[in-house]
Amino acid sequence: MVFEYDPDKSTENKRKHGIDFGDARRLWADAALVEIPARTTDELRWLLIGKIDEKHWSAIITRRGENVRLISVRRSRDEEVVLYESEDI
């Protein structure tokens, strides 16, 4: 899988949320990674919820051909953690 992202946005994401997009690629190592279509009106995007080092993280991505473009990553909200931990997915 090929990841793409804006390096400046990755740096800003690290400053704001404590994780850059390079480290966020580790979400895909989580066998329980949850992927949900995000509510958008323009480009198709997905919300991913997974764990890195036992912490829940949420990412917004889009797909460009075979590539995955990281748009943002942050610590998961409480309701996202509940969704991740749910067996109803």
Predicted ranges, named:
Residues M1-I89:
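Ribonuclease/tRNase effector modules and their secretory precursors
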